[in-house]
Amino acid sequence: SRGLGDVYKRQVFNLWAMMYEEGEYTIRHSHFPSDFSAVYYVDVEPGCAPVLFEVPQNDGVNHKCETFTLQPQNGMLAIWPAILHHEVPPTKGRRMCISMNIDKGERK
């Protein structure tokens, strides 16, 4: 069987570092039109805020979302579809992370 890496040459288009101090947050957003988003947690303190993802639960009639919570840990790498909306509520502990957008790129 072939995986995504066998068919596409992946490319990181944006890469940025973020440092959250106590009380800082990020508003709800997505990284569309990228294919995937990722974050690597370099250094997080106890009490740092989680990432809250909105996962669509569309039944064809109602447009509902379920919230998925990701609690950062030192050395954690998280990758998700860039179309998912997410936010970071005000943090109580410092966190340093590197975020990026990943695109499938051109077919091999």
What are these regions (language model features)?
Residues R10-I79, I83, P89-P90, R95-C97, ...:
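Catalytic core of non-heme Fe(II) oxygenases with the double-stranded beta-helix
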Residues S1-Y8:
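Short, small-residue-biased leader/transition segments that mark boundaries at the very start
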